[in-house]
Every structure is written in C-alpha cells, then in structure tokens.
C-alpha cells in the first residue's frame, strides 16, 4: 500500500472523531430501561463503526488506485458518490447521537443505504474486492436502520417524528 492508502483509510475516521469531540453530552436514549433488548452494547457499536469506516476507506483506495490515482475524470462518479455517502454517514451520527432526531436519522439512513448499494454496483466492474468490502457495511446499515426505526416508532424519542 502506498502512502495514499493510510490516508484513504484514515479520512473516514475523521468525521466520527470530530463529532465525538464536539458532542459533549451524547444522547442516552439507548442506555435507559427502555433500551431495545437486541440492540448491541455501545462498545460493540463503536467497534463496528470504526471497522466499517476503515474497510470502506480501504475499498475507496482500491477504486482510486485501479482508476489510475490522482484527480482525473474517471474518478468523479465512483469517488464522488463515495464522498457523498461518507458525508451522509457522518450526518447520521450527528442526527442520531446529538440532535435526538430519530425520524431525520431514519431518512438519512434510507438515503445512505441506497447510495451504498449503488456504490457496490458501480465499484464492482472497477474492483470486485472493493465492491465486496462494502457488503458488511450494507449489513450493518440494515441493523442500524432497524434500531433507528424501532426507536422512532416506539416513541423512545418523541421529538422530530415525521
């Protein structure tokens, strides 16, 4: 892996690190007595997100490298969509952890799910491994969407319900 590889792996981690530094009092809705029994513990959630962000960063590096690197036109769609989904992923963290807005977080997740699924199809002809590395991300988004939906539906956080 060239010097750019660690940069591609590290950039996705910057958003959550900054968000955690800026959020002084994260939401405690998943820690009270009404917590979903099938919701993973916070440490597991944190570990999964860190792993997912690192793996998707490596996958984006594979696509970038396969298309010749640099900032050329063939990279615009595959890495442009990747950048947009990364921003949506960071937005979800803000909506879910800081804004106590499960309705908006759910809408964000649905858009994010569609973007990641699109990335799998767009990246597959470029680099099959990169596309396959996004599949655990889709699986985790499914779990996260189910948790967020239940929190919204069961009115654990009644504010901002659509």
Swiss-Prot record:
Phenotype upon knockout is: Decreases erythrocyte count and increases reticulocyte count. Abnormal erythroblast cytokinesis and differentiation. Decreases hemoglobin levels in maturing erythroid cells.
Decide whether keyword Protein biosynthesis is in the record: no
Asked whether the UniProt record includes Transmembrane helix among its keywords, one would answer yes
Q: Which cysteines are joined by disulfide bonds?
A: none
Q: Which GO terms describe its molecular function?
A: 5-aminolevulinic acid transmembrane transporter activity; cholesterol binding
Q: Name one GO cellular component term.
A: endoplasmic reticulum
Membrane topology type: Multi-pass membrane protein
Give the tissue specificity.
Expressed in liver, bone marrow and spleen. In spleen, detected in red pulp but not in white pulp.
The highest taxon in the source lineage is: Eukaryota
Transmembrane portions of the chain: 3-23, 44-64, 79-99, 103-123, 129-149
GO terms classed as biological process: 5-aminolevulinic acid import across plasma membrane; enucleate erythrocyte differentiation; import across plasma membrane; intracellular cholesterol transport; lipid droplet organization
Compartments annotated for it: namely: Endoplasmic reticulum membrane; Cell membrane
* Record's function text: Cholesterol-binding protein involved in the redistribution of cholesterol from lipid droplets to the endoplasmic reticulum. Required to meet cholesterol demands during erythropoietic differentiation. May play a role in transport processes at the plasma membrane of erythrocytes, including regulating VDAC-mediated ATP export, and import of the heme precursors protoporphyrin IX and 5-aminolevulinic acid.
Domain free text: The C-terminal region mediates cholesterol-binding.
Quaternary state and partners of this protein? Homotetramer. May also form homodimer.
* Name of the protein: Translocator protein 2
Q: Which gene encodes it?
A: Tspo2
């Amino acid at each position: 892996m060239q010097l750019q590889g660690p940069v591609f792996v590290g950039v996705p981690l910057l958003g959550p690190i900054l968000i955690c530094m800026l959020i002084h009092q994260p939401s405690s809705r998943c820690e009270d007595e009404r917590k979903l029994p099938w919701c993973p513990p916070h440490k597991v959630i944190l570990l999964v997100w860190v792993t997912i962000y690192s793996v998707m960063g490596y996958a984006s590096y594979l696509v970038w490298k396969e298309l010749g690197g640099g900032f050329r036109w063939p990279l615009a769609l595959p890495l442009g969509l990747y950048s947009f989904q990364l921003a949506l992923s960071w937005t979800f963290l803000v909506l879910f952890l800081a804004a106590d807005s499960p309705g908006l977080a759910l809408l964000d997740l649905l858009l994010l799910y569609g973007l990641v699924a699109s990335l799998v199809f767009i990246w597959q002809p470029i680099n099959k491994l990169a596309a396959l590395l996004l599949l655990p991300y889709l699986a985790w988004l499914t779990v996260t969407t189910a948790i967020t939906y239940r929190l919204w539906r069961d009115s654990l956080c009644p504010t901002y319900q659509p």
